[in-house]
Amino acid sequence: MSARSAKFMYRSGNAGASGDLSVEYGTDLGALTRLEDKIRLLSDDLESEREMRQRIEREKAELQIQVMSLSERLEEAEGSSESVVEMNKKRDSELAKLRKLLEDVHLESEETAHHLRQKHQAAIQEMQDQLDQVQKAKNKSDKEKQKFQAEVFELLAQLETANKEKLTAMKTVEKLEYTVHELNIKIEEINRTVIELTSQKTRLSQENTELIKEVHEHKMQLDNANHLKQQLAQQLEDTKHRLEEEERKRASLENHAHTLEVELESLKVQLDEESEARLELERQLTKANGDAASWKSKYEAELQAHADEVEELRRKMAQKISEYEEQLEALLNKCSSLAKQKSRLQSEVEVLIMDLEKATTHAQQLEKRVAQLEKLNLDLKNKLEEVTMLMEQAQKEARAKAAELQKLQHEYEKLRDQRDALARENKKLTDDLAECKSQLNDAHRRIHEQEIEIKRLENEREELSAAYKEAETLRKQEEAKNQRLTAELAQVRHDYEKRLAQKEEEIEALRKQYQIEIEQLNMRLAEAEAKLKTEIARLKKKYQAQITELELSLDAANKANIDLQKTIKKQALQITELQAHYDEVHRQLQQAVDQLGVTQRRCQALQAELEEQRIALEQANRAKRQAEQLHEEAVARVNELTTINVNLASAKSKLESEFAALQNDYDEVHKELRISDERVQKLTIELKSTKDLLVEEQERLVKMETVKKSLEQEVRTLHVRIEEVEANALAGGKRVIAKLESRIRDVEIEVEEERRRHAETEKMLRKKDHRLKELLVQNEEDHKQIQLLQEMVDKMNEKVKVYKRQMQETREGMSQQNLTRVRRFQRELEAAEDRADQAESNLSFIRAKHRSWVTTSQVPGGTRQVFVTQEEQSNY
């Protein structure tokens, strides 16, 4: 396997047949684990966002409580102002000028209230428009979220398919390397066989030339014999009749001797052939031993049996060779004895005239031998032609295999280059995916933090609304107190008019005390209303002028002044409490503003990260397109490799190991595909869970919107109450209301900003949903591609079965050829043994049957007599 980095290199069978589809199914199963880790990070980010929203909701509830407390305090302030108004009504008769001034102030407050109402209505309208915009933005964010989810699913599917294709391509590259190595080995073996055939051819040609030389020598001997025949024809006529029988016997003996010589020569040739066959068998044995060592795991039993057969043949051949050597020694001894007899006979023939018939018969025998030698020569030529044909066929096959090997080497180099390129691209894609996923995790985390901040701000808004309500209640209480004070002042003024005459002396002391108390009140009011000092100073001057005018009529109002002092002390205490409460509310609002600034900065950072994620997603899409193009090229290469495999059918007998390896690789590919399918199913389940979480978050957003609407309704009711209170409030209360309204506006602005940020987060969520949907679509496409690859694997399995069948057939054919060769060698050996036995039997038979002696004697008178004694033994 190639880089069982699940580099799933599809090489001629998805692990050997994807033509170098180096899509790292690397083995890159690490990519799937990375995706799972990133999905876990996304779920963690969702949980953190939920926590942010919960915190914002809590802060919103706290703000609502604060607004309620403020409204209650305002109501209390209105009650206290009503008591003050009642006191002022009692004193209206004495303080006409003061009433006019109060009416002027009331008109001014009404005008300010009218302006405030208009502003408030405009603000409410703006808030309604903003709410509509927020709703639209929420819908857009939902859509974008769905798109983002689809994109996430598509990316996951693309990653899985890319890894699978890479693994298959790596496998195919390794398979092709293995096949090329085996083909090189086979080509080396073929070259060895070609060299052996050429050596056999040269040897046979040498033997042929030697045989031709021998034929020429025999022809020369024939010519010499014919010449001798012509010379001795006249001399042999007299002795011809006597020596016919003896010459026939001698001729038969010589024929036997010559046949023995020919047989000896044939036996020598056969021994040479057998020695060569022995060498070939030894070579085959060495080859078989090498093959047994290399293919021991698969063909150990067959090779062992073959080795045993070869060893038995070797033993037989050794025995036969030893027997032949012994027979040769015996024949050589016989030949030496025959040669001695022949030399003796030739000397006798030279002496005797009767040798002429022997020469004639010898010539006839030589002609027969020449005919036999010519027949042998023709047979040898036929054998040579057959051997040359076989050699040419072997050379053609070797050339074709060499060309195929060159093609395979070229294809292998291309596939290796493509594998390296695919590995580099796969690394780049994995790095880009890792960066994208890290960016996605950061974005989810930031979105979660933003949602938490939104929840916290909503809780703060609720607390501020509660504080606002409390302030309204306090304001109402203060207004009631002011009304009571005005009523008491009116009563005091009426008493002053009745008691002017009686209490002129006490007026100065009362005036001093009253002035001191008014100064204390003014000081406390200045502390409570820092922004309204100018108006309080103006009122103070007016009250001082009125008091100077009424100094003569305030002697009788000592008791009323004491009561007023008590009420003023109470009011001062209430004002101090209100001031402290206002300071706390202001501090909380400042904290809310700071938190809003932090959330704004976070939103900006999230937007920048989203843009980076979009860029990364575009890069991932580009990488996906490149991977698809590479996949198509790899499919084309797979087709080319299949054609190459068809062309390599001639070498079926030696490719069984390749097909077995291919089958194992196919099984591994099936297993890896199953594992990848299980992982895809797990990822789909996790994506479904993330979808459910997103749906829950959307439901929570809907709930938040309902809460916002309810809060807006509460704000409207509070505004209505404020308007009612403003109609009856005094200048101080109206100023307090104006302050509170300004603070409420600030809070509303902050809430609007938070809504805007929330809308942006919803947009981001919609984009993520869209991306997730796209990723799901990609996952489906990858499943389809996996099915196509499975079909390709099935087709390649069928091809492997066909190849195996062909391999078995070729193996059977080769085994039959080997058997026929062995049988032919055995037959030839048996024939040689039979011939040797026949020669021995003939020699022994001739020796036993025919024994002759030639003697010569010199007769007086110069005549020479030759006596031939012949002994024949016949066995009946």
Swiss-Prot record:
Keyword Cytoplasm in record: yes
Coiled coil: 29-855
Region (Nonhelical region): 1-28, 856-876
Location(s) in or outside the cell: Cytoplasm, Myofibril
Any one Gene Ontology cellular component term annotated for this protein: myofibril
Family indicated by similarity: Belongs to the paramyosin family.
Subunit structure, interactors included: Homodimer.
Annotated protein name in UniProt: Paramyosin
Taxonomic lineage: Eukaryota, Metazoa, Ecdysozoa, Arthropoda, Chelicerata
